């Protein structure tokens, strides 16, 4: 794993992630509160290796709120999770040095200012897509996915290459993303490296 300071990396990732999704963030609870406003949750706290006291404070804030998530990057206290319900277990923050790439055949990129969407179509249907945003010298990659019927064809890798092609053209030299267990294998094959583990929880539903 990389050994760069996690608070700074999280701030850099959040900056780009919020840009890709058109959402806002604010400092809160020794971390960040992002107003996600998605079907899955309304808001999400992000903490880096919190102390037991810091975690307990956030648990109290989300008590009874299944629509508010808590994501912890790095170490996690063993105590203090009783007020939370697990959402994900085995995700990672990942990072890479971006390199100039040729836009793969069949990949279309649609960009506006600091944002881009890469799309792969098969017979007129969207088979795979992904998006990215550039903030400073960072490119944050997000929502990389392939439709079930088109998996195992290398399309996600081409989407990543198309996004990298665009990001480098915008002056980015570092890539950041949050990877699921499934996605991590793809990113590792493309040269991405793990930075730190992350786990996500939600507040328990009221009884």
Question: What residue spans do the PLM features occupy?
Answer:
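N-terminal charged segments
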Residues: 1-69, 73-79
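A short, internal acetyl-CoA/4′-phosphopantetheine-binding micro-motif in the GNAT/acyltransferase core
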Residues: 46-51, 144-151
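Conserved acetyl-CoA-binding loop-helix of GNAT-fold acetyltransferases
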Residues: 55-59, 146, 152-165, 169, ...
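Conserved active-site alpha-helix within GNAT-family acetyltransferase domains
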Residues: 76-85, 157, 169, 181-198, ...
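Acyltransferase donor/substrate-recognition loop-hinge adjacent to the catalytic core
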Residues: 83-117, 122
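C-terminal "cap" of GNAT-fold acetyltransferases
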Residues: 89-100, 178-181, 200-207
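A conserved beta-strand-loop-helix scaffold within acyl/acetyltransferase catalytic domains
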Residues: 110-148
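Conserved hydrophobic beta-strand within the GNAT/NAT acetyltransferase core sheet
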Residues: 141, 174-179
